[in-house]
Regions:
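Hydrophobic cores of alpha-helical transmembrane segments in multi-pass inner/ER membrane proteins
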Residues: 1, 9, 13, 105-128
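Membrane-interfacial loop-to-transmembrane-helix junctions in polytopic alpha-helical membrane proteins
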Residues: 2-5, 47-57, 78, 146, ...
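Membrane-interfacial, low-structure loops and terminal tails that flank and connect transmembrane helices
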Residues: 1, 120-151
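Membrane-water interface signatures at transmembrane helix termini and the short loops
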Residues: 57-116, 172-177, 181
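Hydrophobic residues within the alpha-helical transmembrane core of Major Facilitator Superfamily
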Residues: 15-18, 70, 91, 166
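Hydrophobic/aromatic-rich, well-ordered segments within soluble, folded domains that form packed cores
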Residues: 12-15, 19-22, 67, 183-196
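Membrane-interfacial catalytic/cofactor-binding modules of polytopic membrane enzymes
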Residues: 7-65, 133
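Membrane-interface segments at or immediately adjacent to transmembrane helices
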Residues: 158-198
Length: 198
């Protein structure tokens, strides 16, 4: 339950980011081309990234990445390749765009899609055994005695939070005009890379 609750906003961010990219400037490659060109301005790659085919590739691959990555990382057969693509995507964004800590945070939070015990696979057996012995001595209650399920009140509050996260990103639809230009309803709508006007 708790792990799915943490995965939900991450998935929502990716999917709503993909939905936000379904617009003419992004799909035609104009917005991604301007962003990439600005990010690599003055480098030897600047002329190459301004090619229309490269801009289209960036636009469409970014859109597909946003829609597919949460589900590809959740599904065990595609998890490793999906995580590798997330590492490349977020590392690229960190170095090319000025969007602060978001790419690194998103990269680390992508590990939420793995099984809960995945870190154990990387820890040597002798360390696991020592940790287990120490933990068993310190623990006052057995896991069977702990109530790991949320109360009805907490479920109600969490349901309201989920509803808000589902609805608020679409409030821009109630403002007349094109959100990309007037930016009404832009905040909290997962439209981070779409403020570039072309």
């Amino acid at each position: 339950f708790w792990l799915w609750l943490l995965r939900f906003p991450m998935t929502l961010g990716y999917v709503y980011g993909g939905i936000a990219k379904i617009e003419p400037d992004w799909l035609s490659g104009k917005a991604p081309g301007a962003l990439i060109g600005k990010g690599l301005e003055g480098t030897f790659l600047e002329a190459w990234v301004r090619l229309p085919s490269v801009s289209l590739f960036y636009g469409w691959s970014g859109l597909l990445f946003d829609f597919l990555i949460p589900f590809a990382v959740l599904w065990k057969p595609t998890r490793k390749i999906a995580f590798l693509s997330a590492v490349l995507f977020h590392t690229h964004n960190y170095f090319v765009f000025s969007i602060g800590i978001f790419p690194l945070l998103a990269l680390f939070l992508t590990t939420l899609y793995f099984e809960p015990d995945f870190p154990e696979q990387w820890i040597p057996q002798w360390i696991k055994q020592q940790w287990s012995n120490w933990y068993c001595k310190k623990r006052k209650k057995s896991l069977k005695e702990l109530n790991l399920y949320p109360s009805k009140g907490l479920v109600s509050v969490l349901s309201l939070l989920i509803l808000i996260q589902l609805v608020v990103p679409f409030r821009h639809l109630f403002y007349p005009g094109w959100t990309v230009w007037h930016e009404e309803g832009h905040w909290f709508a997962w439209r981070m890379m779409l403020r570039q006007k072309t």
